[in-house]
């Protein structure tokens, strides 16, 4: 018996989406079908998080995003944000937030939108900052 969380994502073409994601992130393939478009699925992990891509199939009630970006993002902590960001842009992803160095918080962030309608926050931690320290910094910013 398995327990855990799996993120299921409906896209226009699961096989194409997986090819793109594996070229940008470190992935581990679990299973992948090779059926006619509309019937495929790919299960894989990105840094240990299980993701399940499914082809859009309106007859089965599975709709991929259309012309709008879904208001949820996947936050991926990567070892080299500049390289990952460049790969995403090179694959036609749209920059929503540029590389932003938040050195006081110990991170560099960026947000990109993939060509399938989903947002990805890229996140590189370069210094461990405790919750208490981050909270105090936010409170100080709110007081200023």
Model segments located where?
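Vicinal oxygen chelate
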Residues: 1-8, 25-79, 85-113, 124-144
């Amino acid at each position: 018996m398995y327990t855990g969380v799996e993120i299921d994502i409906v896209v226009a073409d699961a096989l194409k989406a997986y090819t793109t994601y594996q070229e940008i992130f470190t992935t581990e393939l679990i299973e992948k079908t090779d059926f006619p478009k509309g019937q495929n699925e790919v299960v894989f992990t990105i840094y240990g998080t299980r993701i399940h891509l499914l082809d859009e199939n309106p007859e089965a009630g599975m709709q991929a995003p259309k012309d709008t970006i879904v208001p949820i993002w996947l936050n991926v902590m990567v070892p080299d944000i500049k390289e990952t960001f460049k790969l995403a842009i090179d694959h036609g992803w749209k920059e929503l937030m540029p590389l932003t160095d938040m050195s006081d918080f110990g991170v560099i962030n960026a947000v990109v939108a993939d060509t399938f309608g989903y947002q990805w926050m890229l996140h590189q931690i370069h210094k461990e900052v405790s919750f208490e320290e981050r909270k105090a910094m936010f409170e100080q910013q709110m007081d200023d």
